[in-house]
């Protein structure tokens, strides 16, 4: 209802969108199965897209406004960080002591529950290509040779050890306050495409870092205090070999 070139289409095989007035179509595959969508509706106030499947409920794409800015030229960029909608600052309700998505407490397994949109500020970004590890880069180089039936060069022990010791790459979104002080680092997916990551408007948890293998099971993860209302900025970085490189 704002950009006449942005169209949505419900089909027998999912939902598609077009940024060219219908000349080309792209599938919206995040979080939806490959099923028919019989009806679509736009919630204008929240800029949400609702799709009904008539048999498996309905799905909601929260705040599709980043799609209005998508153009063929924009997708030529290596990375894109879209503008962030103002977040609402409040303390989320915790029914029956639950503070995790999907927690049913004592309601029983038959109690139906669907996840709500994540609390806080939602960041949307685009990656043209996946950020690969050294091992993944080597496999990508070797694939054409394997398909051609040729031998692949042996990497050698030094390279294999380096691959084994390499930390996984990550997208890191850095939140700063009005004084340019770092408030939070949030990791996001490194695969190609559009991604969303939410900041819960909190500082990091004060608890010391513990490896996952030694963490005790609990109903809730430790959290920091809420950041005060104000103006914050977010910066997109990629982390390779433990070093951050700012992208936007």
Regions found by a protein language model. Give the residues of each.
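Glycine-centered tight-turn motifs at strand-turn-strand junctions
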Residues: 182-225
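Conserved aromatic beta-strand anchor motif in extracellular beta-sandwich/beta-rich domains
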Residues: 173-177, 236
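Short acidic/polar inter-strand loop motif in beta-rich domains
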Residues: 57, 205-209, 237-248
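Surface-exposed coil/turn segments at beta-strand junctions on protein surfaces, enriched
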Residues: 116, 166, 190-192, 225-229
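Short consensus segments that form the blades of beta-propeller domains
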Residues: 7, 161-165, 222-226
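Contiguous beta-strand segments within globular domains
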Residues: 94-170, 196-198
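Beta-propeller blade termini and top-face loops
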Residues: 1-111, 118-121, 128-130
């Amino acid at each position: 209802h704002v950009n006449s070139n942005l169209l949505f289409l419900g089909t027998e095989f999912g939902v598609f969108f077009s940024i060219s007035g219908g000349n080309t179509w792209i599938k919206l595959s995040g979080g939806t199965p490959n099923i028919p969508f019989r009806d679509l509706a736009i919630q204008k106030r929240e800029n949400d897209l609702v799709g009904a499947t008539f048999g498996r409920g309905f799905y909601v794409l929260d705040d599709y406004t980043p799609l209005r800015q998508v153009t063929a030229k924009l997708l030529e960029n290596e990375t894109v960080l879209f503008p962030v909608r103002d977040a609402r600052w409040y303390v989320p309700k915790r029914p029956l002591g639950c503070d995790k998505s999907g927690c049913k407490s004592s309601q029983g397994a038959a109690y139906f529950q669907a996840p709500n949109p994540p609390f806080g500020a939602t960041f949307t970004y685009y990656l043209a290509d996946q950020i690969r590890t050294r091992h993944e880069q080597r496999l990508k180089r070797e694939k054409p040779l394997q398909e051609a039936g040729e031998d692949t060069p042996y990497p050698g022990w030094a390279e294999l050890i380096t691959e084994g010791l390499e930390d996984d790459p990550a997208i890191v979104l850095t939140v700063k306050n009005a004084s340019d002080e770092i408030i939070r680092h949030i990791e996001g997916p490194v695969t190609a495409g559009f991604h969303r990551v939410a900041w819960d408007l909190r500082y990091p948890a004060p608890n010391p870092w513990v490896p996952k293998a030694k963490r005790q099971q609990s109903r809730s993860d430790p959290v920091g205090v809420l950041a005060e209302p104000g103006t914050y900025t977010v910066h997109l970085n990629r982390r390779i070999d433990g070093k951050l490189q700012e992208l936007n």
